[in-house]
UniProtKB/Swiss-Prot annotation:
Disulfide bonds: none annotated. It holds the Pfam family Aminotran_3. It catalyses: 4-aminobutanoate + 2-oxoglutarate = succinate semialdehyde + L-glutamate; (S)-3-amino-2-methylpropanoate + 2-oxoglutarate = 2-methyl-3-oxopropanoate + L-glutamate. It is an enzyme of class 2 (transferase). This is Probable 4-aminobutyrate aminotransferase. Gene3D superfamilies: Aspartate Aminotransferase, domain 1, Type I PLP-dependent aspartate aminotransferase-like (Major domain). One of its GO terms (cellular component) is cytosol. Its EC number is 2.6.1.19, 2.6.1.22. The modification N6-(pyridoxal phosphate)lysine is found at residue 281. One of its GO terms (molecular function) is (S)-3-amino-2-methylpropionate transaminase activity. GO terms for biological process: gamma-aminobutyric acid catabolic process. Its cofactor is pyridoxal 5'-phosphate. It comes from Bacillus subtilis (strain 168). Pathway: Amino-acid degradation; 4-aminobutanoate degradation.
Length: 436
């Protein structure tokens, strides 16, 4: 902590924040973070917080992992930023090689690096359009892809992400996506799949012709949309449809990647090989880095100079990402993800017996969520209750986030390095919030 930071109180920092920082930037917790380690954060007043938010899925290897810190320190001492477009450097190339090696599929792959998740999605769209010579972009209802103009256009939730920011990019369409908890009463999952798949097919008759579509962009598990998990059958149908019609199938793995669901990429659970994968968040343990990985012929459709950016694929970010990949392997975080998810799931089902407002429990690996409803029969979303639970947690030492179109989903994005004892301590705080 710097001397300046220590000499100013939390209240004074909060006043400065309100005076000098745009109110358009939200803060889920008004404390001042000064130190993070593993799955714990400490504020300016010395209070400890157990982290179930993970910087919105950015910290799968935890806060300030020693190997990440050492890699970044070493890199900063040697080279901070020559600009890859000016002079290339080894870490960028090494990271591209490693990611191409772990990405699904035996085909030849290439990668590019950028700064943010939204940039990765934008560049996936650019690549798909260049490769197919088509314009149309299809995303899905309840999907979230970023806050730039193109990615806002692809995003489903109007407030707070899109309201008043138009006009939006043309030739962007949103296809139906399954939501099994909210399916029609009495309908089986199989029948519901039939219905949604038919609606997906009809979408390409009523809304946009497939031969005009460059890419379909899908989150294998919808993040901001509420941790909605599609069936293997639905995902495979979408991938097959894309292949049949020459459409680039893009897996948006920005929140789901790097062991969050128990595999490097969530799309692996669905036995589908995407054409392109977008990555960011936990890729570099909190440093700004994103990328697009995919079929070599697609990445090479762009001519030199058509992709990239001033800070894209910085040496510091690439060094951190290489350390992250080592940590995932050395510490078995894919396996640990499933263990964490099971602990959360088991506890959530205990709660469900006691609290009727817990409507649904769902997870893939450690990407877990509980849906808060007003009535288990009507399944009406209860945003107010979910917000109160999250507020209680944040006031009592647990960083916790909500999600979903209706804001009624409690989501778990804890670092995968969390111990069982710390995880259970955090769950105890959450349980107190459920009772409050």
């Amino acid at each position: 902590m710097s001397q300046t930071t220590a000499s100013i109180t939390t209240a004074q920092w909060q006043q400065k924040r309100d005076q000098f920082v745009s109110k358009g930037v939200s803060n889920g917790n008004r404390s001042l973070a000064v130190k993070g380690e593993g799955a714990e954060l400490y504020d300016l007043d010395g209070r400890r917080f157990i982290d179930f938010a993970g910087a919105i899925g950015t910290l799968n290897v935890g806060h300030s992992h020693p190997k990440v810190v050492e890699a970044v320190k070493r890199q900063a001492e040697e080279l901070i930023h020559p600009g890859f477009n000016v002079m290339m450097y080894p870490t960028y190339i090494e990271l591209a090689e490693k990611l191409c090696g772990i990405a699904p599929g035996s085909h030849e792959k290439k990668a590019i690096f950028l700064n943010s998740g939204a940039e990765a999605v934008e560049n996936a769209v650019k690549i798909a359009r260049k490769y197919t010579k088509r314009q149309g972009v299809v995303s899905f209802t309840r999907g979230f892809h970023g806050r730039t103009n193109m990615t806002m256009s692809m995003t489903s939730k109007v407030k707070p992400y899109k309201f008043g920011f138009g006009p939006f990019a043309p030739e962007v369409y949103q296809a139906p996506f399954p939501y099994y908890y909210q399916k029609p009463a009495g309908m089986s999952d199989e029948s519901y799949d039939d219905m949604v798949i038919q609606a997906f097919n009809d979408f390409f008759i009523a809304s946009v012709a497939p031969e005009t579509v460059a890419c379909v962009v899908m989150e294998p598990v919808q993040g901001e949309g509420g941790f909605i998990i599609p069936s293997k059958r639905f995902v495979q149908h979408v991938a097959s449809f894309c292949k049949e019609h020459g459409i680039v199938f893009v897996a948006d793995e920005i929140q789901t990647g790097f062991a969050r669901t128990g595999t490097y990429f969530a799309i692996e659970h669905f036995d589908v090989v995407p054409d392109l994968i977008t990555v960011s968040k936990s890729l570099a343990a909190g440093l700004p880095l994103s990328g697009v990985i995919g079929r070599a012929e697609m990445l090479d459709a762009a001519a030199p100079g058509e992709l990239g950016g001033t800070y894209a694929g910085s040496p510091l970010g690439c060094a951190a990402a290489l350390a992250v990949l080592d940590i995932i392997e050395e510490e078995g975080l894919n396996e640990r993800s499933e263990e964490i998810g099971k602990i959360i799931e088991d506890k959530a089902y205990e709660w469900k017996q006691e609290f009727p407002f817990i409507g649904d429990i769902r997870r893939l690996g450690a990407m877990a969520a509980i849906e808060i409803v007003k009535d288990p029969d009507t399944r009406e979303p209860d945003k107010t209750k979910a917000a109160a639970i999250a507020a209680y947690a944040n006031q009592n030492g647990l960083l916790l986030l909500t999600a979903g179109i209706n804001g009624n989903i409690i989501r778990f994005l804890t670092p995968l390095v969390i111990s069982d004892s710390l995880l259970n301590e955090g769950l105890s705080i959450l349980e107190a919030g459920l009772r409050a």
